[in-house]
Amino acid sequence: MFKKAVKDHSAAAARPLQSTIPNSSGVASTKLPPPQSIGVKRKIELTSTKSTLGSLHSAVYFDENDFDDDDDLDFESPDPYIPPARIEKDSFREESFHAAKSNSTLSHKADSQSAVTVSKTNYESDIKYPDLPPVPPDDNPGPSSSALPWSSSPPSHFQKPAAPRTVPWRKQENNIITIDDEAKPETPARPAATAPWNKTASAIKEEQKELRRQNKKAQAQKTQSSTKHHMPRAQVAPIFLSQKHVLKAVVEKGQSIFFTGSAGTGKSVLMREIIKKLRDKYRKEPDRIAVTASTGLAACNIEGVTLHSFAGIGLGKEPVPELVKKIKKNQKARNRWLRTKVLVIDEVSMVDGDLFDKLEEIARLIRNNGRPFGGIQLVVTGDFFQLPPVPEGHNREAKFSFAAASWNTSIQHTILLTHVFRQRDPEFADMLNEMRLGKLSPRTIQAFKELSRPLDFHDALEATELFPTRAEVDNANSARMARLSGETMTFNAVDSGTIQDIQFREKLLSNCMAPQTIHLKKGSQVMLIKNMEDTLVNGSIGRVVAFMDEATFDFYVENENDFASGKFDEGDEDRAARARKKIKGMGHRDGGVTVTRKWPLVCFIQPDGTERHLLCQPESWKIELPNGEVQAQRQQVPLILAWALSIHKAQGQTLQRVKVDLGKVFEKGQAYVALSRATSKAGLQVLRFDPRKVMVHPKVIEFYRNLVHASDLIKSKQPPKPQRTISNGDEDVYIDELIAEAEAY
């Protein structure tokens, strides 16, 4: 039995191994299987002379030197899988053949060749794979969404899947998360180290000023919130809508304009805005703009020069040829005429008509230009119903500028401003307009007579009394000063300028609002003559409550209640004294005014009834030429005594409390100027009202009948009027309609 088993085993070993592999039908096949994996070597002996066990041993034996070659251990990355349906049988056989050939060893070359021969001849299998029917190529393929002919899926399965739904709250949540993700965290800046012991005196002073500014702002907001239900809210705009048309015509279109209006229509505000815009326009050539006025007072208010000073004609009484020779000898005056492109004239109502004609002819001769005013653009303003020009001779009647022969050719448009800002009461504004025209109704006369009652206010301020002459003003103020007790403080102005002649310089500055010398006492009623802040403007009335330096004022602001009640601690007084001593040591030692000088502390009453304290320190007033040369300059505290004021100096001012005695009025327009300074009937007292004192020149009434509103500048064009013909031929906007007297006022 043992021999039979060995014999059977030997016969099985002599038979090829491939013959034992069953086929798909369950019958053992004699064909070779697919070759082994790459890198695995196996010895296959088809014929053997050894014993059966030896043949088995040699069939599975691995020599120790078979793996000495490193190439046998390098496994290559497999190729990407290719579907079997697309692989041809012949190619697969060739690849298998090459793989088997590369894995054979060199030591058994003959045996390997015989094995390959057998595998190549016996690889054909009995398995029959089904062949798919051939598909002809389609030249016109249908859309990707169409159903395939060989597929059972509906066409909807081949469409692009719909986007997933998103609920609203999920979308909102995603947005919030996205915003948080995009926000980049920032490391907070390290706060600057504050060392109170390591600050300079100037830094401490700036901090104190900032603290005072914040406290004042908070108090103002508190006052406004407490009074907003009792006081009407005033909305004051720098430039009103109708005034913007004038500003555009002057700055953008370069037209020569004369704009006028009753008292309180914003002529001064509009003129300042025009000057500002023109200087911005010619900022590279500042000497192209000449800012002038008919009087020194008006010139100081707009920081310009008088018209006579600009022209270089002195009094201007000589004939034009002599004046031209005089100007040509003065190189500066000649250059001013040649360089000027825009000439601004304020308060033209006091410019004589003959002088206007002389200036127009001088401009044409000096500039050698035949156009009106030698091609210079004119910006003129004033109210001819107010103070008239002063005639040269006593027997000669005053001649207004609009009566000059060159007025109509030099001025392209004459504009009337009708919106009144100063008087918020329509009834009071109508009363003033009737007085302006010289046509008083019985009702208006009775209303003015009822204003003779005394003014009663619950504070220490009195109404400012207006007088026609300067002597009356000085007498009234001196009498009131004599009634006050206490020390008199004198403040002298510091004058300077390019004019070395002291007398001539003082003559120029004599018309300035700031006096050369002013005497004040505690309790003096004063008026502010400089715009300081929004609520403290030119014309604000106040009372002097103390005299102190800047250091004391800082201490006063912090302890205002203690100052009022007279309660002080010795420590507080010592602290204030040390502060004054420290600042005094830092003062200038060059002979100028030191910071320890005491200045008047004034308590101003604002329109809403609140108080405002201001330490009035020196301000500057300049008389400046177009080229920037300052002919004269005055530094003085911005205050004047305000118990009494001249009508001439009051022109252009806005006063909350006014007292007028019309029995002393002697000139046309004086009554209207005096009464129109008031803002309401509650702050106006009129003594000895006489309708015969209300005098208006008939030529002025005739002139104002043919004026156009400012808004008509942007309306449609009409054929030009003879008196409004534009000499330079430029296309422009013409007057649309004539405004009747009743409609204008």
From Swiss-Prot:
Enzyme Commission code: 5.6.2.3
Biased amino acid composition, Polar residues: 17-28, 101-122, 217-226
Record-stated family: Belongs to the helicase family. PIF1 subfamily.
Catalytic activity: Couples ATP hydrolysis with the unwinding of duplex DNA at the replication fork by translocating in the 5'-3' direction. This creates two antiparallel DNA single strands (ssDNA). The leading ssDNA polymer is the template for DNA polymerase III holoenzyme which synthesizes a continuous strand; ATP + H2O = ADP + phosphate + H(+)
Residues that coordinate or bind ATP: G261, S262, A263, G264, T265, G266, K267, S268
Gene: pif1
Chief localisation class: nucleus
Protein name as annotated: ATP-dependent DNA helicase PIF1
Keywords: ATP-binding, DNA damage, DNA recombination, DNA repair, DNA-binding, Helicase, Hydrolase, Isomerase, Mitochondrion, Nucleotide-binding, Nucleus
Domain of life: Eukaryota
Species of provenance: Emericella nidulans (strain FGSC A4 / ATCC 38163 / CBS 112.46 / NRRL 194 / M139)
Role: DNA-dependent ATPase and 5'-3' DNA helicase required for the maintenance of both mitochondrial and nuclear genome stability.
GO biological process assignments: DNA recombination; DNA repair; mitochondrial genome maintenance; replication fork reversal; telomere maintenance
Basic and acidic residues biased stretches: 1-10
